[in-house]
Amino acid sequence: WHIGAAAHYAQIDMIARTARMNGKNVYFPIGIDRNGLPVELYTEKKHGIRMRETERGKFLDLCKDALDDLEAEMILIMKNLGLSCDFDNYYRTDSKEYRALTQATFIELWKNDSIYLATRPNNYDWVTGTTIADAEIIYEELPTKLVHMKFKTKDGEVIIASTRPELLCACKAVIVNPKDVRYTDLIGTKVTVPISNQEVEIQAHHSAQIEFGSGAVMVCSYGDHNDVALFRELDLEEVIAIGQDGRLTEAAGAYAGLKPKQARTKIIEDLESKGFVEKIEEISHRTPVSERSRAPIEIIPMEEFYLKQKGSVEKMRELGSQIKFYPKMHQQILMNWLDSIKIDWPISRRRYYGTEIPIWYCKKCSEPYLPEPGEYYQPWYLECPAEKCPKCGFTEFVGEERTFDTWMDSSISPLFITKFKKDEEFFKRTYPTAVRPQAKDIVRTWLYYTLLRCENLTGKKPWSEAWIMGYGLDEKGMKMSKSKGNALDP
């Protein structure tokens, strides 16, 4: 914790105390969020180890020990602040009871066909080795090179500008704007991609910006999400140029094994030496990076579990408009996020310290088996509860190793504290809750995902009011963060 977090909780306490003074019967639970990537990174750094090189059970124990120490410090600060919450019954998001509820909600949504398994291009954080959702991405202006490259035509050349020349091997088309008269006669003809030498077609497409670079754009798998959309629309065959280790694959030929930045430097050198470069510009580029690792993300086809959300956007907009925001302007953060949703939510992660996805697969026919809800399951560690596969009768299973996105846990906190699926009378009395106090930087994650999940499971919004706090700032006006070293200890 730092002083900003302490101030945040002190203000939450003021809300609770004011309600009591107005004669209300206040339910003020306190929870400790103990899942996710931060504790894994903390544990790796503290012990000088790597998660994937450590036995899973041992790594989980080390994470739990670290969390126990951090939690004790956090609770002490809360008590010293004089918070009036219920310390005798505070909950942890990594408890068996909490994780069992997360798994139970997954099983219910699976049976309702709200969750599915699919292989799609996903945001991939190669530093942490897992898929991440759009909500876990931020954009930073980073320096890079805009390389104007010569693609050979039958009678000449076309200049194409790109910040990702390392993906030339994955180029499957070149697009130009149909209104760009410079390329009218070239639409439908072929060009040869430099270095990798494959022939691709020049196609007309409205997304090509006439004013950017030369106006001609290479379409590769995958430089950005526009490439993803174009590959689907134009029915192009993808080339997996970057692997899960964050390095170029064999598809890159002589550049295989290099990290993208290394490959970019080497390919630019080779392009220049072979006469394929018209010019190079030093630019500042709006780059998508992982919110956690701050590494530029790659887009890699991976099999993941998805929770349907595209079809719920208008419903979320309706519910969001019914929630009273304090201050009112922060309601727009939610609305802007709803406007940006284009894909379903990838909810599976390739990490260790999180709630496990409760599925076993038949070793013979691969049929998934989901157990009865109510218990906490660890498929990577425990035997399948089923004696035989319900589809083929085979008796051997293999457990799912992936965990949930931590927001799958956090998003059901209103359900857990109101004893959803546990005490129907208490649930009816306390749900929906009155107010959600939280920081504004997680409106598009915690607030939105809670709204989505709770509506999916109950048909109701989880609260009627949202109190949104800003950031604790240092003397320079920068957001306080322990990682930046500018935070004050409360």
Language-model regions, residue ranges each:
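Carboxylate/His-rich catalytic cores and anion/metal-binding grooves
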Residues: G23-I32, P165, C171-K190, E400-F404, ...
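Conserved active-site neighborhood of enzyme catalytic/cofactor-binding cores
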Residues: W1-I30, D125, I138-K150, V217, ...
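Glycine-rich, acidic and aromatic/proline-enriched surface loops and short helix-turn segments
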Residues: D69-N80, S196, S410-F420
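Short active-site loop/helix that positions an aromatic residue
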Residues: L41-K45, E166-N177, D227-L236, L415, ...
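Residue patterns forming the tRNA-binding/recognition surfaces of aminoacyl-tRNA synthetases
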Residues: E44-V158, F212-C365, W446, M478, ...
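N-terminal catalytic cores of NTP/NDP-binding nucleotidyl/phosphoryl-transfer enzymes
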Residues: W1-Y42, T102, A161-T163, I195, ...
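Short conserved beta-strand and strand-loop elements enriched in small hydrophobics
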Residues: V147-F151, G188-I195
